[in-house]
Regions:
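Short hydrophobic/small-residue motifs within alpha-helical transmembrane segments
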Residues: 56-58, 144-146, 311-313
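Discrete transmembrane alpha-helix packing/kink hotspots characteristic
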Residues: 31, 59-64, 117, 146-151, ...
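Helix-loop-helix hairpins in multi-pass membrane proteins, especially solute transporters
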Residues: 64-201
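Hydrophobic transmembrane-helix bundles of small-molecule transporters
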Residues: 160-273
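Extracellular/periplasmic helix-loop-helix junction of adjacent transmembrane segments
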Residues: 34-63
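Helix-breaking motifs and short loop linkers at transmembrane-helix boundaries and internal kinks
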Residues: 43, 75, 93-101, 297, ...
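Small-residue hotspots at the loop-to-helix junctions and early N-terminal turns
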Residues: 43-50, 137, 229-235, 300-308
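12-transmembrane solute porter fold
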Residues: 11-27, 31-36, 53, 68, ...
């Protein structure tokens, strides 16, 4: 069964799914372009908001192993409407609080909940687009461009008003979508109703604690001088103990939360290695920000525009991906072209970091970075 009632026209169904993607996918506890405004507005050090940014991703990861069981446990309309209302309330909380730990915790919960809505859109869109390969080419291209656009407007709204207004806007959009979903979605189950008691909540807690403590170390390490800080040492020990307990528990469960057997497959190991390499290339964003803001003197809005320059490259990568998967060609050359584009971006920027660097000179390296990311 799909998401919407039988009387809803197909174009309206597609429009609703696009609106859900536009609102839910960029949603987070913090927005990267907003961090400097949040630091100035709350008087809290930047590291808390970096930690909150990690927390959103950790929440999404924690939801992944149980997301299908959640999908089949509740009626479609009830689940999506309640989740949108909760996301709207959490966004409003972030707009009104100046307590950093509240923002960190809401970011974690927002990540968990937005993943539950996202999975509702995966299967209908995959069927509509006709194949997994084409779906990934279209879907991830759309999401990557959407993230760049939302980051830009987050900065623009923060400059014209304040950083709280973007959270209020996100909250209002969630409430409006909840009303539309209540009208257009059906109140039936996706498939056979399944119980939740097979979900191991302790494993989820251990998973979250492992990565939240690790994210704390990565976020606050430099600020607290790494191993010279008791907090960093204690967080590192807590992350290690949590991971050890998580691994031991998975070995004793009949239905483990995470199966470590997947890490014995060569495809998974190769994929993890490529993700690590991609992460290293994407890590150059921090160097790029230091150069653009600290050396060239760009303001936050101009700096956000640089990320918009990646959109044509991302779009081209998505178009190539669709044709590549449609022709069922081997992925080696496609992946190689992406890493080659990333390498070219890094080389160009290495030789271009001078005070005479013009704004127009950003177009080529950012296009290559976008293509590599896509």
């Amino acid at each position: 069964k799909g998401l919407f009632s039988d009387w809803v026209p197909k174009p309206v169904q597609l429009l609703m799914m696009v609106l859900l993607l536009i609102v839910v996918m960029p949603l987070g506890g913090v927005y990267v372009g907003n961090i400097s405004f949040m630091v100035g507005g709350t008087g809290v050090i930047q590291e808390y908001f970096v930690w909150a940014n990690y927390a959103t991703t950790i929440g999404m990861g924690a939801c992944m192993p149980v997301v299908m069981r959640m999908k089949m446990r509740f009626k479609v309309r009830d689940k999506v409407v309640v989740l949108l209302l909760l996301l709207g309330m959490l966004s409003y909380v972030n707009s009104t609080t100046a307590i950093p730990m509240v923002i960190v915790m809401t970011s974690l919960v927002i990540g968990f909940m937005k993943m539950m809505i996202t999975i509702e859109l995966f299967l209908p869109l995959m069927v509509m687009l006709g194949g997994r390969g084409i779906f990934y080419g279209v879907f991830y291209t759309f999401v990557l461009i959407l993230n760049q656009v939302s980051a830009y407007y987050a900065v623009q709204v923060s400059i014209e008003y304040n950083f709280q207004q973007f959270f209020v806007l996100a909250s209002v959009l969630c409430f409006a979508l909840a009303l539309l979903c209540w009208v257009f979605m059906h109140d039936k189950y996706f498939a056979l109703k399944v119980p939740l008691h097979y979900i191991d909540w302790l494993s989820i807690l251990l998973f979250v604690s492992t990565f939240m403590f690790s994210a704390y170390v990565l976020s606050f390490g430099k600020q607290q001088d790494w191993l010279n800080s008791k907090n960093i040492i204690n967080a590192s020990i807590a992350a290690f103990v949590s991971f050890a307990l998580l691994a031991i528990r998975q070995m004793t469960l009949k239905r483990p939360y995470i199966s470590f057997n997947i890490f014995t497959k060569s495809n998974v190991l190769n994929g993890l290695f490529m993700l690590l390499c991609l992460g290293m290339f994407l890590g150059t964003t921090s160097l790029q920000n230091i150069f653009s803001v600290g050396v060239l003197g760009y303001d936050q809005l101009t700096n956000a525009k640089l990320n918009l320059m990646m959109s044509p490259g991302i779009l081209l990568a998505g178009i190539v991906a669709v044709f590549w998967f449609k022709k069922e060609r081997p992925l080696k050359m496609f992946i190689f072209s992406g890493f080659a584009a990333m390498t070219a971006y890094a080389v160009i920027m290495y030789f271009s970091m001078v005070l005479e660097f013009n704004y127009e000179n950003w177009y080529l390296p950012m296009f290559l970075k976008g293509f590599g990311m896509g």
